[in-house]
Amino acid sequence: MASTPSSGSYDLAIVTPTEDHSLRSFSLSQGNVQQTFLVSTQDGAFLDQQKASFLQSYSKDQSILGLVFEFLQFLLDEACPPAPLGAFLGAIESQCVRDANIHDLIVSEPEAKNIIRTYYRAHAVAGLNPRPAPSGLFSTVNIEAHRILMAFGGQGSTNLVCVDELADLYSLYQPLLEPLIASVAPALASLSREPSTLQHYLGREIDLYSWLTIPESRPDRAFTATAAVSFPIIGLLDMAHYYVLGKLLDSDSPKRLRSALQGLTGHSQGIIVAAAVAQADTWASFLAQAQWAIRLLFWMGYECHTAAPASPLSSAAIRDSIEHGEGSPSWLLSVRGLRSPALDALITDCNRRLPESEHLSIGLINTERNIVVAGSPRSLRGLCLRLREIEADDGQDQSRVPFRQRKPVVHHTFLPVSAPFHSSHLRAAADRVKERFPDASSPQVGDLLTAVYHTRTGQDMREMFSPSNNLIHSLVEAVACETVDWPATLQVSRSKPPSHIVLLSSSRLSDLVSEIVDGRGVRIIAGTVLAPTDPAVLGGKAELLTTKPSQAPTPWAELFKARLVAGPDGRPILETRLSQLLQAPPIITAGMTPTTVHWDFVAAVMQAGYHVELAGGGYFDAAGMTTAIEKLAAHVPPGRGITCNLIYASPHSIAFQIPLIRSMIQRGIPIDGLTIGAGVPSQDVVNEWIQTLGIKHLSLKPGSIAAIYEVIEIAKKHPTFPIILQWTGGRGGGHHSCEDFHEPLLQTYRDIRRCSNLYLVVGSGFGQADQMHPYITGEWSLSFGRPVMPCDGILIGSRMMVAREAHTSPQAKELILAAAGVADSEWEQSFKKPTGGVLTVQSEMGQPIHKLATRGVRLWHEMDKTIFSLPRDKRVAALNARKAEIIRRLSADFAKPWFGYNAAGDAVDLEDMTYTEVIARLIRLVYVSHQHRWIDPSYRQLVLDFTYRTLERVSNADYATDKLDLSQPEQFVEQVQQLCPAATTRRLHPDDVRFFLTICKQRGRKPVNFIPALDEDFEYWFKKDSLWQSEDVDSIIDQDADRVCILQGPVAVQYSRRADQSAREILDEIHHGLANHFEEGPSQSDRPSLAISEMVSARVTVTESNTHRIIRPTSESLPSVEDWQAFLASQVTGSVRSAIMAEEVLRGSQRQANPLRRVLEPRTGQSIQIPLDGRDLRLVEDAKNRPLVHIKPSGDQEVAVDFYYYDFVETPGNLRFTYKFDSKSLSLVENLDGRDDRVKLFYAHLWLGRADLSYHRLSEVFEGEEITLSSDLHRHLHNALRHTVPDATASATTNTLPLEAAIIAAWKPLMEPLFVAELQGDLLRLVHLSNSIRYTPGAAPLEVNDVVATKSQVRAVTIKETGKTISVEAQIFRSKTLVATVTSEFFIKGSFSDYETTFSHQDEAAIELKVQSAIDEALLRDREWFLLDDPTQSLIDKTLVFRLHTVTRWKDQSTFTSLKTTGSIYTKHWNGTEQKVGTVASEVVECHGNPVIDFLQRKGTVVQEKVPLKHPGLIDNGSRTIRLPLDNALYSSVSKDYNPIHTSSVFARFADLPGTITHGMYTAAVSRAVTECLAADGETGRLRSFSASFVGMVLPGDQLTVRIRHEAMCHGRMVLSVAAYREGTDEKVLQGEAEVEQRTSAYLFTGQGSQAQNMGMQLYDSSAVARSVWDEVDRRLLDQYGWSILNVVRANPKQITIHFRGARGRRIRDNYLAMRTETRMPDGSTRLEPILRDLTAKSESYTFFDSRGLLYATQFAQPAILLMEKAAFEDMKANGLIQEGAAFAGHSLGEYGVLASLVDFLPFEMMMSVVFYRGLVMQFTMERDSNGHTGFSMVAVSPKRVGKYFDEAMLRIVVDLIHRQSGKLLEIVNFNVEAEQYVCAGHVRNIYILSGILDLLSRSATGPQLVASLRSASDPAITDVAKEIAVYLEKAPQLNNPTELKRGRATIPLQGIDVPFHSSHLRSGVSVYRRFLEERIQAENVQVDRLVGKFIPNVMGKPFAIDRSYLEEAAAVTGSSVLRELALAA
């Protein structure tokens, strides 16, 4: 199929034809795929015309093949002439179908049927015959290799749709089927109209053509399902399938098909079709045979249907059957779930109650458990009722019922048939049919040309009957009267069973066949199915017609066959799939508590060479399990892995054990496997374990059939991961199910074996080789009539408990040896009574458990029956009723005796014991006196805990409890008696009874070994922790083993007959016994290798020269890795061959898969060069003919491996490894001498360009060279990114370099510390964890041509369980100024112990601590590390800031060798400034924490610079999806990171990577670029920091989605979370953070006039920070001046009266009186007077009033505005929104807001007082009339609104004219927006005049002329404008109230302002106000650096400065003598 690229559109493309003589091209295309055909020029032109019409309506959503055939169908619909149709069809044949068959092509096509239909119809219309199918199955058939049985279907569930299915087949293959239909249709029509049948069909005669072509003509399905119709139709359907198949194979003759068959048969009526087919040698004879077969089928159907015995049922009975899921009663009942003997017994029982005419009989045996019963509907319904009585209910849980006591799970349904076929009921009907086919006119058995297998016996009918026998009569008997034995029919038991069974049946016959033949090596092909759902299980029609050979599956007996191979010592080893996985014989010692809890026992088994499971169920905390695994790991043989067995039903244990195993594997502990018992985890849980733990295999122990299928589903979800299914059934020792051992295996084996990654291990009841052998061979299943079912391994447990190394006590072993055991058929009796010495009881988890039937266990069994079976609320009463008896039995028989005994030896309750009696009894039970040991350390503490309680309760004196001596427990009671004599006589207090019971159950304490009470917890006391005593009988009373619980299986216990064998001896005995059963096969080392010729003919080419053999994989199809490696191994010798074949490499105690096998995997473009003597091997890069890897022998049995790397370096890098082959573990052992140094030298050559290691120490500073950041670097970085992030181009147009340029600049100093000699580690296992790049605050970004120098230092080297982390910090300097800091973290995987090299330098986050009390101060002063510069100063009410640095050195992972914390202590002042007041100096050794930081974090608060957003969100669209480059070479070159894993596939494979991996730095750079695009508008300079952690592997070409979230703010910078995810899986591969600067901002503060009621109150309600500012000021103003600013803002009252009563009132009055202003006297002198002139020392109150509301009075408006601005600013600051370095400006009063927020030169409360004073001065120094009016106001003026002809110069002239002509104030005081807005202050009358004049100039037609004359006049006073002003002055009213001012065209009065701010009128108050400020402002509090360059004063309009020029200019503008003097001094 020709393909051409396209844009991905799904429109049909028209391709211009290309003329070539008489041929031309004609093309169709879909999406990016095009199909081109060669046709004649004439036909091509016609097809082009048709295509033009076709384009209007074709379906776009389909494949190219579907499109081609849709166009072909279009031609048919358009009645295309045969010539062009044939030409196009021929082109399809040659270009699409080619040498295949059309059925081959349509298997996966959704429109398969349409294609088939069109294909064959087109052939018919074009007059062409389809080419014969080149069947691989039938063409090359060999009777020995391919034994094909063909089977036809019969009656069944498809009866209802048989007509529909025939019609469907006819529509597909109508041209092929027409002869067959034509030959039989008349016969059926005639037969159904005969007089004898007419009455039955009655208008529903079989009109075949109508039924096939007109759906509406078909009778209802209930009628067609009857035998009278379905018999002939189903028979015809089967013959039609055969006819089509034969025609497709050979249109001339059916002989080709028939002769290829071993035989034919049919299910039920299908045998008639088989007999007809078997006689046909030509198509003509086939049609003749079809006619008699159809006639026979018709009469059989009709006669049987009409002869069916009447058996009326009531409607209620019918309804009942339907409601029970049995269907409508009929004459055949399918029964599934019962075997034939059981069903026979039921039938016999039913028949006893039935007349013979209604007897039941078995009609068909479909499978062992699928049987069909024939009889009348009434009788069959009776059988159904009987089945309901004995069967389990749907969904009934019988898991706790022993298997043999369960109700059978039976499914029984009526089949839609109308006669009791295969029964004696049809004898008369059969005779009538025979009469219609007399011998003379009927075929004979001898006419059969091929074997036809009889359905009763499975015999060839030619051997079963005489050749002259009437064939039809035999067939009638078989279908009507004789039982069908389908398994026998299928020949599976013959010596040469079929290799293939081809089914031509519309029914689900394949299910029946599959159940019978699975595992026997038979391929089932459903020849009626176009596309089977699972081709691996069931073939379809295409498989019959394809050229590809059809292979029969390998029988289970062969596929899973065990064999012998030679072990390392030459002795034979039994090998199965399991042993290949585990590298051990297939005998597993199961995880058992307590036996395999002990690491030494597990080690003994592993040292013996066998697999064993460490039982995690015996560990209750991580520490104990860690210790055990570490000890075990130290004792396991090299190359062997540990498997841990965990109890899934114990969530507490799983919660700590799974993370523990994960961490230990990460540390390198060789844990290979995990076994999960007591439950099957969910898919999600298993998926997480497989993905994250690092295990190599997982074993699951299902307890039921349902659980087995759960395991199967898990295996399907992880098809490449080994899952071991351990099946033990119910006969196993210890916990067990109630399941039969064999039955679940029989039911699930087929499905288990369909999962190639599932390993089947069986256990329970095993103990010797002879007994195990049938399970290894699979012969165990033969007795069940099933094929051989081999198991992969055997699980043993019980017998291992008597091994010498087992901790089982000798007394317990003796009891095990004495137990007789039982046969498998008897073990279920253990539920009721001791059986073979074993009894089943219910464990503490409520599960059945097998234990030896000791006295103790027999008591347990009795308690289960009589006590624990009761509801919990009834147990105590039952216990009390038998109290004396139970106590006696406990003390006499049980491992846990009754606790309560007094000194006299009488059994008593706990409350009746004295305190010393309790202590004495405790010691008696928990201390083993004759061995001088405590049973468990927690028991010793139990004694002490109760003794402490005793002393607290009974003694009145204080005793030092640490003086209690338990070293001699026997004398301990005497100590207590001496200390507290009363304890001897005083009985336990009720509280202490409860206390004792509580501490007995304390978590973490071993459960007590006695029964303290017969209470509601009796089951806990009795059952908890019951197994350990079998390993410590010495701790039991009288050392009586018959008291204890000993796990054993009832079947397996019989095989324990000796206690003197070691674990090795037991296992070797079994293993060698098994091996003796097998013929010795070839040894492992002598397995035949694949011949060269075979490989060459497959997928390898070999070229030989005189010296070498060059081997290459073919480019078309690479060989499998296994074949390739086996072939390479066959070409080399000695140690090189061992290096290739070894599956694992041992590196010290660590194991890993052999990397050389990965390196040598077949790859196009690489070849293998081997000398003819096979001594070495080179992997060669073909394109450049240079070696990449060289493997050669080196010394005795050693091999050296050289790796070469050529890119980016002048001389190739060379890295050598050496290995030695270990024959015992079959692994390579790596020589580690100097290995890590060689790796370092290799990378030093690549990264640093040198050939030696660093001479530095880790603590030194590493200096880099001074480099220039060139434009080439800028360009290369841009080029590396532009294809991935096309819109990241902004940086390319500027000289600003992206952030990652800093890493490139610092590359060598960052890398050099990795080569320090003292830094141990394998750099091949180095991964880059993270990068962080941060610009120094205020530093400009790096730019092209910057010259920078770099130095680095190692900040930390730390060791974790899985490796070593190295943190390196590099500082980049520009002009000797720090510009950026780069921090890189690296991680070297491995296990390290060189803690002496570890350290960490940590700059701690600043911590603020508020000293609020004397206690706080005392606590601080008490710290030794807290050193004040002045110890006498008080710290109370001060805020301390700690800025510290910690240096840490480690002893081990949790202990510090030393920890040194130093730094400075500062006090934080009210304005944020800090003053050093002390130091911190702390150094501690051998510690686990930082006492300084821990204390400060508890008492103080960590200063957080970043403020999280309340509602984080996505930036812009939030994400960008990008695709990474396919090659990493460009970025390697740019970044200088020449690590070969980025560019060399060889090194990547060696490192076990899925391919060359993309640089983490590149992924970070891409993510940075996306961040800039989305969050910084592409402005590189705005990105101030970027950090990235590399959390996932990224490959070239990966598609990533980068997501940006705005998470926080920091000093005005956006803090962004940056994450990159792999598209498709959403796996996170990068997590980072960026800080993006805002565009340069300015913060503007408004002035008076902006006030409004409730201003700032919304923020007050929502912000705690703003609220605290408001509240604090409100409190101060209320306290100082008696009024609430919150009230003023919220209510805007018109008046406030302040009362001066009491001490507080007098103080407030004094505050007002102290506020003075300067008043000029008539004589020119000045004096200070109170601002509130009518306030005296005797005033009792004062009232502020303003008719507009006091918020509009200056003295209240100004502080309110300032407070609102300050609160808003502090809220923004607290949220991190204030940008560092931003400009600040305030409009008028707003300047106070700037200074209060930016500089804090006054405490804000004082600033508020200053502004209040300022407002009062302005308000009350103005003269006011009786109404309070000053006569002044302000107005905003917009010259632009006057007209284009009016500007600022004209405004100045007009203002000046009004001022001069009126003699009153009018000035421009604010220049806000040039030409847009100005503010004038002046007398109200003048403002009125200004508004009128400007209105005149804007509205008058002469306005422009008036302004022009004013502009040109030498004296404005004589202009027309001046005259107009004079007119206004005369007419203007005597205004004094600003409220009368109206808005003009160019003017807006400022409402509420009656003070002419910023005007000369107020100048007189400047000196007084200056003095007022000077008294309050201290020079040292003015932080000038915060003002310079940031604050923009009103009077200057440019940033503040303190240089001379700025001061001079300011002095000139203001006329300030003070500024003038400062300028002179500057």
From Swiss-Prot:
One of its GO terms (molecular function) is (3R)-hydroxyacyl-[acyl-carrier-protein] dehydratase activity. SMART domains: PKS_AT. It comes from the Eukaryota. It comes from Aspergillus oryzae (strain ATCC 42149 / RIB 40). CDD domains: FAS_MaoC. Residues 148-526 are annotated as: Acetyltransferase (AT) domain. It holds the Pfam family MaoC_dehydratas. Fatty acid synthase beta subunit; part of the gene cluster that mediates the biosynthesis of oryzines, natural products with an unusual maleidride backbone. The two subunits of the fungal fatty acid synthase oryfasA and oryfasB probably form octenoic acid. This fatty acid is most likely activated by the acyl-CoA ligase oryP to give octenyl-CoA before the citrate synthase-like protein oryE catalyzes condensation with oxaloacetate to form tricarboxylic acid. The keyword Lyase applies. Residues 1512-1625 form the MaoC-like domain. Its EC number is 2.3.1.86, 3.1.2.14, 4.2.1.59, 1.3.1.9. Pathway: Secondary metabolite biosynthesis. Residues 1130-1604 are annotated as: Dehydratase (DH) domain. It catalyses: acetyl-CoA + n malonyl-CoA + 2n NADPH + 4n H(+) = a long-chain-acyl-CoA + n CoA + n CO2 + 2n NADP(+); holo-[ACP] + acetyl-CoA = acetyl-[ACP] + CoA; holo-[ACP] + malonyl-CoA = malonyl-[ACP] + CoA; a (3R)-hydroxyacyl-[ACP] = a (2E)-enoyl-[ACP] + H2O. This is Fatty acid synthase subunit beta. One of its GO terms (biological process) is fatty acid biosynthetic process. One of its GO terms (cellular component) is fatty acid synthase complex. Keywords: Hydrolase, Lyase, Multifunctional enzyme, NAD, NADP, Oxidoreductase, Transferase. The active site is at residues 268, 1788. Residues 1643-2016 are annotated as: Malonyl/palmitoyl transferase (MT/PT) domain. Residues 579-824 are annotated as: Enoyl reductase (ER) domain. [Alpha(6)beta(6)] hexamers of two multifunctional subunits (alpha and beta). Belongs to the fungal fatty acid synthetase subunit beta family.
